[in-house]
């Protein structure tokens, strides 16, 4: 079989391509060895230092340009790399190496050279003209000390730990009192030891203001109620009503505390409740819940009017011998149970309504509807059974 011209043509093309590949491999191998001599590796992070080291090596750039075999970025030509890192073929200054520093080198990531005289050196951490971008700047030259952490400025407008003399700092609440305003409460000559006058609601327990303002009060001032002698008009708190619990511990002028009418809630009175006087008109007591009344509840007086118990009352007594009594000035009703559980609940099943009325003379009518009507048929049926047995 004779070889055709086409076969020889294809063979020549293949051999030429192989020789070209070998030439490129040689060029790239030489370029890679030169990179290693400058300490460069395949790591992109070392690209800047390695290429700057090879800026003056013409053979390196020639090898690299023969096949564009950059080991860093195959998409960037050798010419572009040299122009960027070596300032070759670029006018108007470079973005890389420079001995005196570029004016627009703010884009540099703090290269070894080129940022010493940058105008936009705010990202370098160096001290600037105003020190606003300094990481460790104490702002010693600031007149106002607005950003000082622990300054000793005279105005102290925003000091955290100030030693102000003018007293305009935020932590000094009594600037008019001067240095005496911050003295301890024990040295306040105008305040009593126990704050006996005690008309100040916040001083009833401690006897002195926390900020020491009681030291400046006198007996004749309008605000002297916290440290006056007794002639202050603002000190007279004896006219407070019985419901003011705050005045119960405020000195001798407080008339509250003698009344113990602590009845509250919906009729559940715990402890002893005594109320004297004349209770006239309509008096309604509504008991809700379990109906247990702890303690003693007594009322004395004329007792005229009506007493009505309504609602969903449930009086339960489960002890051995329980009793429930309700006494007023004009009526009395009582229930007693022995050894059993007596329960009144619901409507029409033992609850009913208990109404006592009269004119206070002790007479009246007590009506109970419902009651224990369910027990009557039980007793009658038992009696009939017993009678039938006796007859037999």
Curated annotation (Swiss-Prot):
Residues linked to a lipid group, GPI-anchor amidated serine type: 363
Biased segments, Low complexity type: 96-147, 162-191, 199-232, 251-371
Glycosylation sites: 75, 139, 155, 195, 270, 274, 294
Signal peptide: 1-16
Induction: Induced during yeast to hyphae transition, during biofilm formation, during oralpharyngeal candidasis, and in response to serum. Regulated BY FLO8, NRG1, RFG1, RGT1, TUP1, TSA1, and UME6.
UniProt keyword terms in alphabetical order: Cell wall, Glycoprotein, GPI-anchor, Lipoprotein, Membrane, Secreted, Signal, Virulence
Main location: secreted
Compositionally biased tracts (Polar residues): 148-161, 237-250
Membrane topology per record: Lipid-anchor; GPI-anchor
Keyword Nucleus among UniProt keywords: no
Start and end residues of each stretch annotated as Disordered: 95-375
Keyword Ribonucleoprotein on entry: no
Subcellular compartments: Secreted, Cell wall; Membrane
Record family assignment: Belongs to the IHD1 family.
Protein name: Induced during hyphae development protein 1
Organism encoding this protein: Candida albicans (strain SC5314 / ATCC MYA-2876)
């Amino acid at each position: 079989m004779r070889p055709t011209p086409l076969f020889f043509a294809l063979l020549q093309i293949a051999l030429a391509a192989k020789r070209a590949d070998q030439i490129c491999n040689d060029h790239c191998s030489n370029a890679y060895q030169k990179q290693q001599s400058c300490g460069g590796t395949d790591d992109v992070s070392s690209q800047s230092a390695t290429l700057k080291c090879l800026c003056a090596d013409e053979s390196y750039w020639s090898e690299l340009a023969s096949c564009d075999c950059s080991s860093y970025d195959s998409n960037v030509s050798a010419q572009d790399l040299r122009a960027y890192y070596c300032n070759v073929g670029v006018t108007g200054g470079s973005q890389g190496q420079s001995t005196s520093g570029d004016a627009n080198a703010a884009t540099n990531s703090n290269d070894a050279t080129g940022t010493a005289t940058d105008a936009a050196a705010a990202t370098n951490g160096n001290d600037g003209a105003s020190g606003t971008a300094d990481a460790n700047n104490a702002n010693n030259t600031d007149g106002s000390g607005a950003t000082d952490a622990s300054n000793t400025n005279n105005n102290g407008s925003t000091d955290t730990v100030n030693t102000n003399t003018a007293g305009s700092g935020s932590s000094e609440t009594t600037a008019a009192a001067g240095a005496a305003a911050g003295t301890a409460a024990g040295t306040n000559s105008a305040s009593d030891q126990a704050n006996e006058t005690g008309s100040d609601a916040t001083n009833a327990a401690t006897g002195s203001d926390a900020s020491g303002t009681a030291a400046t009060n006198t007996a004749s001032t309008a605000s002297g109620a916290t440290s006056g002698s007794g002639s202050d008009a603002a000190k007279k708190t004896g006219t407070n009503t019985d419901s003011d619990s705050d005045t119960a511990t405020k000195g001798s002028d407080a008339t509250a505390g003698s009344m113990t009418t602590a009845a509250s809630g919906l009729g559940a009175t715990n402890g002893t409740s005594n109320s004297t006087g004349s209770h006239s008109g309509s008096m309604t007591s509504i008991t809700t819940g379990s109906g247990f009344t702890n303690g003693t509840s007594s009322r004395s007086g004329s007792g005229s009017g009506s007493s009505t118990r309504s609602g969903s009352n449930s009086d339960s007594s489960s002890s051995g011998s329980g009793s429930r009594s309700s006494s007023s000035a004009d009526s009395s009703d009582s229930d007693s149970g022995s050894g059993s559980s007596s329960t009144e609940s619901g409507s029409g099943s033992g609850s009913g309504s208990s109404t006592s009325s009269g004119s206070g003379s002790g007479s009246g009518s007590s009506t109970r509807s419902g009651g224990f009507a369910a027990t009557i048929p039980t007793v009658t049926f038992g009696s009939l059974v017993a009678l039938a047995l006796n007859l037999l």
